[in-house]
Curated annotation (Swiss-Prot):
UniProt-recorded name of the protein: Transcription factor RLM1
Pfam families: SRF-TF
Task of the protein: May function as a transcription factor downstream of MPK1 that is subject to activation by the MPK1 mitogen-activated protein kinase pathway. Binds to the DNA sequence 5'-CTA[TA](4)TAG-3'. At least some RML1 target genes are involved in cell wall biosynthesis.
One GO term of the biological process aspect: signal transduction
Membership in a protein family: Belongs to the MEF2 family.
Note, other: Present with 736 molecules/cell in log phase SD medium.
Subcellular location: Nucleus
Keywords in alphabetical order: DNA-binding, Nucleus, Phosphoprotein, Transcription, Transcription regulation
Region (Disordered): 103-156, 173-192, 202-318, 330-424, 472-514, 532-631
Residues found modified as Phosphoserine: 120, 164, 374, 377
Bias (Acidic residues) ranges: 121-134
Biased composition (Polar residues): 103-120, 260-276, 296-312, 472-506, 621-631
Length: 676
């Protein structure tokens, strides 16, 4: 079915008339534009609506076109009137809606009229030529749509009375433009705020406006309230005070000169403007004499110096290769033993039997950090030797804690550079246990230090020493200087540092802690739990002989920094479990005594090794030797784990309970880890 043409006559309904006007006006303007473009003609279309509003489309200046229309007599005129299209006639004058003007004095204009004059964008081309039989329905739908937004487009009657028709047209056209541009559709207050300049931007200097392209007034306001003297700082510097800002350097006439003091790298300077509040509080509490730490935002920053310091710190971190020290856990450690948090000191991860010793060690380490000497390694240093005691048994001769530090000449007379910085001169075999600790260690900074030794020479030297020793000939007096240290004694010529055991090449200076003679093959170095006698594997034993009895800490009231290997109570009625052998691979016991220099053993006393009596600590600090009936058979019955032929951690007590493993970052075969 084709379209049915409607009768061209006045539409009686106001809403339908307004909708028809909107659609046909838009189509007329569109056709006029297309005609002007396609045919290169000058067009001016002027419409005076029933709401006393002019609607105009012109491809040229309307006044100029009207001037030529009226005054240029040389231009031809082709005129048409309504009579050319039907039984209509031309009006003699302009029709002004007088009723609308009169009603505007007291009332607003009807919603339909105002709405009808403002919706001219939705018309199409076909509505200009002909109407269809659905015109009535379409007009009703358009009227319903116009009622929703009619209240927003009403013009006050007082304004319509005072404004001229041209002003009314511009006012109605402005409402149409608001629909097209979402920025103009804002509420009046928001639109006014958007047009008004920012007072903070006006008050800022041009230099600050270049630094900050996007205005953030809420950040600036809060920052100015908190820091009135530093209101010129940009919000980026305010939001991230931790990062060094190069913007603040522009406020200085010239940056202060960079002065590198001799102790610059030992205690680097931190610029005040790049400090965090937490760092600032720490510097103020430590009594720093920096004059710029009163307010870290007010003082100007020296960005160049900060960048140099960060570069130096980064290079120092790269040069110091971290080594992870892993300690095997043991369930017999003291529950109140303090775990220190000093990763750069080997003494901080030592096996402390009690919390008092640990706290005292930490205090001593902090006070002596400037001297770079570990208090534990300086308290008792020197090699251990096997000597015959008064009772005819073999004992371990421990170094003298009172001996001053000197060069180690290899004969055991001078006790400098003892390889055990774990606590009071006792090796890890005699130490109590501690919870599982993984601590990064820093290598020693001594040039030509012990970690730069020849690995093949050390391995060959150890093999020769272990071949000379036999498990059955341990009763002989054999100096354990090289056997226990695993290195030539003359290597250490300088004092021990507190940076932990040297790393970087194997074998380490503590590699002997995990090595001892095998019961059957004396030329092969094995783990300490393999050094049990042949009687430990007797068929009558019900328990597996490969493990060790619980290692307990000793009660030592006279010296809080000593690290004991057995936990003997103050009474002399200890059971056999407390009198059993410690983690020494020879099933030996300690003869402990106290001295004023925090040494576990004195120079004049002996420590028994094979079947000797356990020394029992009393509250007075003296020691009493008591006979120990625990032989290999008795010790085997006290063991409750697997045999010593496997070092795996699968029992309650492991022989590796006091051992450390250093895992370096160097991936080079066997050198990627070292046992300490």
């Amino acid at each position: 079915m084709g379209r049915r043409k409607i009768e061209i006559q006045r539409i009686s309904d106001d809403r339908n008339r307004a909708v028809t006007f909107i659609k046909r006006k838009a189509g007329l303007f569109k056709k006029a534009h297309e005609l002007s473009v396609l045919c290169q003609v000058d067009i001016a279309v002027i419409i005076l609506g029933s709401n006393n509003t002019f609607y105009e489309f012109s491809s040229v200046d309307t006044n100029d076109l009207i001037y030529h229309y009226q005054n240029d007599k040389n231009l031809l005129h082709e005129v048409k009137d309504p009579s050319d299209y039907g039984d209509f006639h031309k009006s003699a004058s302009v029709n002004i809606n007088q009723d609308l003007l009169r009603s505007s004095m007291s009332n607003k204009p009807s919603k339909s009229n105002v709405k009808g004059m403002n919706q001219s964008e939705n018309d199409d081309d076909e509505n200009n030529d002909e109407d269809d039989d659905d015109h009535g329905n379409f007009e009703r739908n358009s009227n319903m749509h116009s009622n929703k937004k009619a209240s927003d487009k009403n013009i006050p009657s007082a304004h319509m009375k005072l404004l001229s028709p041209t002003a009314l047209i511009s006012k109605m056209d402005g409402s149409e433009q608001n629909k097209r541009h979402p920025e103009n559709a804002l509420p009046p207050l928001q639109h006014l705020k958007r047009l008004k300049p920012d007072p903070l931007q006006i008050s800022r200097t041009p230099q600050q406006q270049q630094q900050q392209n996007i205005s953030r007034p809420y950040h600036s306001s809060m920052y100015n309230l908190n820091q009135p003297s530093s209101s010129s700082s940009s919000p980026s510097t305010m939001d991230f005070p931790k990062l060094p800002s190069f913007q603040n350097s522009s406020f200085n006439g010239r940056p202060p000169p960079i002065s590198i003091s001799p102790n610059k790298f030992s205690k680097p300077f931190t610029n005040a403007s790049s400090r965090t509040p937490k760092q600032e509080h720490k510097i103020n509490n430590s009594g720093s004499n920096n004059n710029d730490n009163s307010n870290y935002t007010q003082s100007p920053s020296n960005s160049l110096e900060d960048s140099i310091q960060q570069t130096v710190k980064a290079r120092r971190k790269l040069s110091a290769r971290p080594v992870l020290r892993v300690r095997i856990p043991n369930n017999n450690f003291s529950s109140n033993s303090a775990i220190p948090s000093e990763p750069s000191s080997a003494s901080s991860t030592s096996a402390n039997g009690n919390s008092m010793g640990s706290s005292q060690i930490m205090k001593e380490n902090k006070t002596s950090r400037s001297s770079k000497i570990s208090p534990l390694s300086a308290s008792a240093s020197g090699p251990l030797t096997l000597q015959k005691g008064n009772n005819g048994r073999m004992v371990i001769k421990l170094p003298n804690a009172n001996a001053p530090n000197g060069s180690n000449n290899g004969n055991g007379s001078n006790n400098n550079n003892h390889p055990y910085p774990f606590g009071s001169g006792s090796s890890p075999l005699f130490s109590a246990t501690q919870p599982y600790i993984a601590t990064p260690l820093q290598p020693s900074n001594i040039p030509g230090g012990p970690f730069q030794q020849n690995t093949s020479f050390l391995a060959q030297r150890q093999t020769q020493q272990y071949q000379q020793m036999s498990f059955k000939k341990q009763s002989q007096t054999v100096p354990l200087t090289t056997t226990l240290t695993g290195r030539p004694p003359s290597t250490f010529s300088g004092p021990e540092t507190s940076n932990g055991p040297p790393t970087g090449s194997l074998p380490s200076k503590f590699v002997h802690d995990l090595m001892s003679n095998s019961p059957n093959v004396s030329s092969i170095s094995m783990f300490p739990d393999w050094s049990m006698g042949p009687n430990s594997a007797k068929p009558g034993n019900t328990n597996n002989p490969g493990t060790f009895p619980p290692v307990q800490t000793a009660v030592n009231n006279g010296n809080s920094s000593n690290i004991s290997s057995t936990n003997n109570t103050n009474n002399n009625n200890n059971n056999n479990n407390n009198n059993s052998s410690n983690n020494n691979s020879n099933n030996g016991n300690d003869n402990n005594s106290n001295n004023s220099n925090n040494s576990y053993y004195s120079n004049n006393e002996d420590a028994p090794v094979n079947g000797a009596a356990i020394s029992e600590h009393t509250t007075d600090g003296d020691s009493n030797n008591q006979s120990n009936s625990s032989t290999y058979d008795a010790a085997a019955t006290a063991y409750n784990g697997n045999t010593g032929l496997t070092p795996y951690i699968n029992t309650a007590q492991t022989p590796l309970g006091t051992k450390f493993f250093n895992f370096s970052t160097d991936i080079s075969g066997e050198k990627n880890s070292s046992k300490i």
